[in-house]
């Protein structure tokens, strides 16, 4: 067999023509320590802060601490099978989660993976969990109400679309119930809801999901769940993952409501990670940037300008207090970031006033601009009346000789408290809220015994549904009160036919 020089030279020329001098470089580090949800790796000299890293076993982590000798990594998911000496490599991207309509009606973990046993989520879109908040000129003032269906909130501390309203109170005062009822009331309102459960017991989350399913609310809700058995990094990233899912809808011109239940547990998880990464502790052992932890999250909630589609992301963060102390570190931080707070008091809760909203300490700084005119008119004096009643109530127990005006204020106050009570999972449409508050503020309830107020309200609603639906329609569609004489006459007619219970 003879070797021809021409053939060899043509083969070499062919190879040279297709030669590619691009090198595929993977920067790989070695794990030097692993434990409690964090790892340290040596050799990742060019890694970026917040970059996603991949371990040999397929797990992912986020570069959190960039030090001279090694990198501190928080591990996403299980870390039992990561060993010292394992390799970890850069991915060149930051953490992203799947987003879009495919997630609606599903229960997912903070990585966007389904945990409801309903199969794979087919979503081809992703968003980074950390994103820049909309700028000053990208926003507009809150001008559209987000009705919660809860009389005490819609009348006293109204919430607008794009607002951040904190729900704060001790454990077992009804914080989660308020948020769930608000989600239930969004049915038919064209609002997408996201419930982020951070460190909540698996059984509790299961109960909430069943409630949402029972009332048909899972048709427009995404549940993001990071249970107490999950490693701390999962609890830390859960609110950011939920916000990224909400932003996808917001930037497409839709209205979104997101509930963080609760941010106290996220702060505790972040403190745990920071101490394990040996960051210097500050007040209450929280790291120095714990304020930024929550501010960069909540600033992403906004009412976008019309130029950007006019979508909104309304946030209801929940914070748990100890013995009603709202002056602790995390509560004061979040109060200063949000646009108002709903303060729930255990004394009121155990006295049977539910929802246990403390009108004196609760405030909505921007929601008043979004409140409908009819509600603004009927609820105008409600807060001051309620505060005055609370003061009078404490004085009244010391003596029985009260003048007529004081007695009238006490009677009105008792009826106000009774009207604002509301059973669980029973949101009331805004037009019916306006109706009962109109009856209250115009004195139609003054002669009704306190124990009959609830029955009076239900029968009044039924009466208007059957005989005066046009008046309710006017309030619902225009946001204004109908003709004063007509409304008063209808309520008066019903009041005269109402029979109080026999004692």
Curated annotation (Swiss-Prot):
Which residue windows are coiled coil? none
Q: How is its activity regulated?
A: Increases 2-fold following exposure to low pH.
Q: Keywords of this protein's UniProt record, alphabetized?
A: ATP synthesis, ATP-binding, Cell membrane, CF(1), Hydrogen ion transport, Ion transport, Membrane, Nucleotide-binding, Translocase, Transport
The Gene Ontology CC terms held by the record are:
plasma membrane; proton-transporting ATP synthase complex
The UniProt annotation places ATP binding at: 169-176
Q: What induces it?
A: By low pH.
Q: Which GO terms describe its molecular function?
A: ADP binding; ATP binding; proton-transporting ATP synthase activity, rotational mechanism
**Recorded family membership:** Belongs to the ATPase alpha/beta chains family.
What is the recorded name of this protein?
ATP synthase subunit alpha
Q: Which organism is it from?
A: Lactobacillus acidophilus (strain ATCC 700396 / NCK56 / N2 / NCFM)
> Lineage of this protein's species?
Bacteria, Bacillati, Bacillota, Bacilli, Lactobacillales
């Amino acid at each position: 067999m003879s070797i021809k020089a021409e053939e060899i030279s043509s083969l070499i020329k062919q190879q040279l023509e297709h030669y590619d001098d691009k090198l595929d470089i993977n920067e790989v580090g070695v794990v030097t320590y692993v434990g409690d949800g964090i790892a340290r790796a040596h050799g990742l000299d060019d890694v970026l802060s917040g970059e996603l890293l991949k371990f040999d076993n397929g797990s992912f982590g986020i570069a959190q601490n960039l030090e001279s000798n090694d990198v501190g990594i928080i591990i996403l998911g299980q870390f039992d099978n990561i060993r010292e000496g394992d390799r970890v490599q850069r991915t060149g991207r930051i953490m992203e989660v799947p987003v879009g309509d495919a997630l609606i009606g599903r229960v997912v973990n903070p990585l966007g993976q389904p945990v409801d046993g309903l199969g794979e989520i087919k979503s081809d879109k992703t968003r980074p969990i950390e994103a820049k908040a909309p700028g000053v000129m990208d926003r507009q003032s809150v001008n559209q109400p987000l009705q919660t269906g809860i009389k005490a909130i819609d009348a006293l501390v109204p919430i607008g679309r794009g607002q951040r309203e904190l729900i704060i109170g001790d454990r077992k005062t009804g914080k989660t119930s308020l948020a769930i009822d608000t989600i239930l009331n969004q049915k038919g309102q064209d609002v997408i809801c996201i419930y982020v459960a951070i460190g909540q017991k698996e059984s509790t989350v299961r109960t909430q999901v069943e409630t949402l399913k029972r009332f048909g609310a899972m048709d427009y809700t995404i549940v993001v769940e990071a249970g107490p058995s999950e490693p701390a990094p999962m609890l830390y990233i859960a609110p950011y993952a939920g916000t990224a899912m909400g932003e996808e809808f917001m930037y497409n011109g839709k209205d979104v409501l997101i509930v963080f239940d609760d941010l106290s547990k996220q702060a505790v998880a972040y403190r745990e990670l920071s101490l394990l990464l040996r960051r210097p502790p500050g007040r209450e052992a929280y790291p120095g940037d714990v304020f930024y932890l929550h501010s960069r999250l909540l600033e992403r909630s906004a009412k976008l300008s019309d130029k950007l589609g006019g979508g909104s992301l309304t946030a209801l963060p929940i914070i748990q207090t100890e013995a009603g102390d709202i002056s602790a570190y995390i509560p004061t931080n979040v109060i200063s970031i949000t646009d108002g707070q709903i303060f729930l008091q255990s004394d009121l809760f155990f006295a049977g006033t539910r929802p246990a909203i403390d009108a004196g300490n609760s405030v909505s700084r921007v929601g008043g601009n979004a409140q409908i005119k009819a509600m603004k008119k009927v609820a105008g004096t409600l807060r001051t009346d309620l505060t005055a009643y609370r003061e009078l109530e404490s004085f009244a127990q010391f003596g029985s000789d009260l003048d007529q005006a004081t007695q009238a204020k006490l009677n009105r106050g008792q009826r106000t408290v009774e009207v604002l009570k509301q059973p669980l999972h029973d949101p009331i449409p805004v037009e019916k809220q306006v109706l009962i508050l109109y009856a209250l503020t115009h004195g139609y309830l003054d002669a009704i015994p306190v124990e009959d107020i609830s029955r009076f309200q239900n029968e009044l609603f039924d009466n208007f549904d059957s005989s005066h639906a046009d008046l309710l329609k006017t309030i619902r569609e225009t946001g204004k009160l109908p003709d004063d004489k007509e409304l008063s006459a209808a309520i008066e007619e019903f009041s005269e036919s109402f029979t109080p219970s026999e004692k």
